[in-house]
Amino acid sequence: MNIKSLLLGSAAALVAASGAQAADAIVAPEPEAVEYVRVCDAYGAGYFYIPGTETCLRVHGYVRYDVKGGDDVYTGSDRKGWDKGARFALMFNTNSETELGTLKTFTELRFNYAANNSGVDGKYGNETSSGTVMEFAYIQLGGLRVGIDESEFHTFTGYLGDVINDDVISAGSYRTGKISYTFTGGNGFSAVIALEQGGDNDGGYTGTTNYHIDGYMPDVVGGLKYAGGWGSIAGVVAYDSVIEEWAAKVRGDVNITDQFSVWLQGAYSSAATPDQNYGQWGGDWAVWGGLKYQATQKAAFNLQAAHDDWGKTAVTANVAYELVPGFTVTPEVSYTKFGGEWKNTVAEDNAWGGIVRFQRSF
């Protein structure tokens, strides 16, 4: 065998061996393209697409720290020192488009810590009102909303003023289970109808331990609103199925200028009782009013006053100052006069209190 034949045979053997090994080798798949998070600007700032879906998600919330001193303007009692509390609120919004309209969800979790004084020697550190709660959780498709939310008796007219102690004279209960439908026209007109489970006493002052319905008949709320560039006017009527009584509110807002606005709200209840879920003010009627002046881009002045049929008067003023974007400091002072039928329910007729709120929103 000559050298040429030997070399050709060796080369053929090597080719055959390498071909056999290649047949047994594992071929790595091509790497999949990475899907980065995409911004979703269809519903406002802060939304992004959940990867692999067409659903937009927003995560936001705030961290808050309150320092209170003076009297408790809700009860008239002396705090005897500082009361302090903190809250971390975490909120989730989802939005997506369907053939029946926009499908939305909203959830809010609150982590609370509150500590007050002993009430005897003013020593700080008595822990109260601490814990974690799922404050809201609802689903909305078009105008239909189901879940845990605030009562339409509060939200449809626009709450009260932009002050912290806004409900010294309560305008009704807050959180409730509900099924509601809101119609929004293209001409500024809107209407709402809601079937509600009743509040959980987070907005009341006396009376029953809760305001939940006690059978299959829900509370019923209905309202009408008209809004334009000048402001808005809204009215709501609510039926309490437990005590079979009703309450109503009418509110008007007027924008005097781009910086200055005023509002006035009146309410009437068919039953002057603290067991009324909606008419939680004292007596048959109550009135609230206020103003807001945006002094600068960073500072806003807010004032609110209220009076009810049983003789309670409450006045609150604050200045909300945004130190830097997302961080606001709000000093507030409040005064309550317990007159008329309220006079015998408190130790002191007059209560002065102050609060400073530090809040970082994100």
Swiss-Prot record:
One of its GO terms (cellular component) is pore complex. Keywords: Cell outer membrane, Ion transport, Membrane, Porin, Signal, Transmembrane, Transmembrane beta strand, Transport. It is a multi-pass membrane protein. GO terms for biological process: monoatomic ion transport. Coiled coil: none annotated. Its main location: membrane. The keyword Cytoplasm does not apply. It comes from the Bacteria. It is found in: Cell outer membrane. Belongs to the alphaproteobacteria porin family. Forms passive diffusion pores that allow small molecular weight hydrophilic materials across the outer membrane. Consists of 16-stranded beta-barrel sheets, with large surface-exposed loops, that form a transmembrane pore at the center of each barrel. The pore is partially ocluded by a peptide loop that folds into the pore lumen. This is Porin Omp2b. It comes from Brucella suis (strain ATCC 23445 / NCTC 10510).
